[in-house]
């Protein structure tokens, strides 16, 4: 079994963040006609956002306007963004299993 040490994981995350900053202008350069809005964010209690950023870039490249709420977003902020931006798609991400309850809570608030 392979072993990974926390400093290596942290360094690889920093490298990925830097790579995303370099790649984003290239990926979204060919953006077509605006086809709607997407609201995305990482649920409250979770600070991981590399996957969310990649998904956001793909939506932008496909022609969507992306409203990224950031990390550790409370359900109320999702509701405020939905009311303000009237998105076609809402996406929320999480990596930690400890935030599973918050994922359900966010979904309940959005569906209400």
What role is predicted for each listed range?
Residues 1-112:
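Domain-level signal for soluble alpha/beta catalytic cores
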């Amino acid at each position: 079994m392979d072993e990974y040490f926390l400093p290596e994981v942290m360094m690889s995350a920093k490298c990925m963040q830097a790579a995303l900053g370099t790649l984003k202008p290239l990926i979204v350069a060919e953006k077509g006609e605006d086809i709607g809005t997407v609201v995305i964010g990482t649920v409250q209690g979770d600070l991981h956002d590399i996957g969310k950023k990649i998904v956001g870039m793909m939506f932008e490249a496909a022609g969507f306007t992306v409203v990224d709420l950031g990390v550790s977003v409370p359900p109320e902020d999702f509701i405020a963004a939905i009311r303000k931006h009237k998105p076609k798609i809402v996406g929320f991400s999480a990596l930690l299993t400890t935030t599973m309850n918050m994922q359900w809570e966010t979904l309940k608030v959005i569906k209400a």
